[in-house]
Amino acid sequence: MNIQVINKSKHPLPAYATELSAGMDIRANISEPISLAPMQRCLVPTGLFIALPQGFEAQIRPRSGLALKKGITVLNSPGTIDADYRGEICIILVNLSAETFVIEDGERIAQMVIARHEQAVWKEVEVLDETERGAGGFGHTGRG
């Protein structure tokens, strides 16, 4: 699939690390480092602008290594970039650790997954179809 992209950053375009990777790493495009204190959040620009085909979205997800080792994650995970959005892709990061984390220019801060989606059409009814599970939730299956 071809996706139109404008790269106003100083960094390479997002790319798949391996042949079977689902996500592409996205880099910070900042003029100076950002110090992210514990429990602080910030909006990090990427310098990327994209035009997705109809029926697709870009999901912005945390990088597992950054989350595990440093406590840095995407606050609204997954962040959604709609096919009709044409602004700069910016990432909302939050520091869930007890230590300040410094984001450097060009640092890989999140990953982007391109995914198909459907738009739902609501059908109002008086009663829902019965299922074995019914209304059970939040640990109902005994596994949590």
UniProtKB/Swiss-Prot annotation:
Entry binding sites for substrate: R63, S64, G65, N76, T80, I81, D82
EC number of the protein: 3.6.1.23
Gene Ontology molecular function: dUTP diphosphatase activity; magnesium ion binding
Family membership noted in the UniProt record: Belongs to the dUTPase family.
Alphabetical UniProt keywords: Hydrolase, Magnesium, Metal-binding, Nucleotide metabolism
InterPro entries: dUTPase, dUTPase-like, dUTPase-like_sf, dUTPase_trimeric
Gene label: dut
Catalytic activity: dUTP + H2O = dUMP + diphosphate + H(+)
Biological process, per Gene Ontology: dUMP biosynthetic process; dUTP catabolic process
Protein name, entry field: Deoxyuridine 5'-triphosphate nucleotidohydrolase
Cofactor: Mg(2+)
Keyword rRNA-binding part of the UniProt annotation: no
General function of this protein: This enzyme is involved in nucleotide metabolism: it produces dUMP, the immediate precursor of thymidine nucleotides and it decreases the intracellular concentration of dUTP so that uracil cannot be incorporated into DNA.
